[in-house]
Amino acid sequence: MSIFVDIEKNFGSFRLKMAFAAGNETLALLGASGSGKSMTLKCIAGIVTPDRGRIVVDDVVLFDSEKHINLTPQQRRTGLMFQNYALFPNMTVLQNIRAGAGREPDKKKREAAVAAVMDSFGLTSLADHLPSQLSGGQQQRTALARILVSNPRILLLDEPFSALDNHLRFRLEQEVRQTIRDFGKTVLLVSHDRDEVFRLADSIAVVSNGAMDAFGTKSEVFHNPQTRMGAMLTGCKNISPIQVLDATHVRAMDWDMTLEVPEIPADVKAVGIRMHDIRPGQGKTAFRCRVVGEIENPFSYTVMLQASPSATAVGWEMNKEYWQINRREEIEVCMPPEALLLLKDEMKEVLR
């Protein structure tokens, strides 16, 4: 199972230009609101028509502007689940799921498939309920069942947990993970939640301003996001523009720190460090900083450190016990070279 996408769509003030490929895996499109993630899924599903390009799923050409191919949404067999699930409000659970099985001409096979998927998702006892009578989790399971009963070529999940309360998300995330495993084909997951993406996806495409900003396995993207946007979306809150001093040293201008770094790639414009990667310490890579604030989190402290009066404060996260024992007005910290993220403004070429 695979997907290939290379499309462009001009919306006037916004231009979508997406190019990526994925195999039999879960690929997450990680980006901020309005970055083009959901629009990409709509183009794949046939709801929005690109201006140019090509979309292929499992060697079936869904769209090709040069060859004038543009299959209907029904012909594409893409299983798109919207953020709000888009259940028919005046139809029961059973009727909603039957609507998804409409392509099967044999009535007995169609009813057997509906019964099987309802049993699989624990919906049999809710067959006569309307969507308004269901919990958020039951609505999600109904939407997934309606999609899967149609035997789609690919599963497209658009912010599948955004409509759920926090206390429901983790449990339902486990159910979706199992659904993905059972599906066994290509899955595209749209999200702005880095933790959700890391738990569910195999690979990550960072999306910014309608285009791919970074691409790789989830480990690659989190350990080396490569761009400012990639670093921010994967949770790095300490980012500073730099001045390159020599082959192994840069000046973090916002932080007023000279940092030792690994080999510096071309076009690097900024440096970042995750809050939990800062270390207490002494020596040539240490900086004496003034504590200018502390934030108590449920299970940790974030301490704001300033290397000079004019510098931007850097956030350092540590467990509560450490800070309660070592709380002080000034402290020496290290920025380990191996923990520093060397960042470009954007990627000139995205790996596919």
Regions found by a protein language model. Name each.
Residues 4-26, 30-32, 38-39, 46-49, ...:
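Non-catalytic connector elements of ABC transporters
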Residues 38-41, 141-142:
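ABC ATPase nucleotide-binding domain helices that frame the ATP-binding cleft
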Residues 42-43, 203:
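The short alpha-helix immediately C-terminal to the Walker A/P-loop
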Residues 54-76:
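ABC ATPase NBD Q-loop/coupling interface
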Residues 77-79, 83, 90-229:
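ABC ATPase nucleotide-binding domains
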Residues 222-247, 272:
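C-terminal boundary and immediately downstream tail of ABC-type ATPase nucleotide-binding domains
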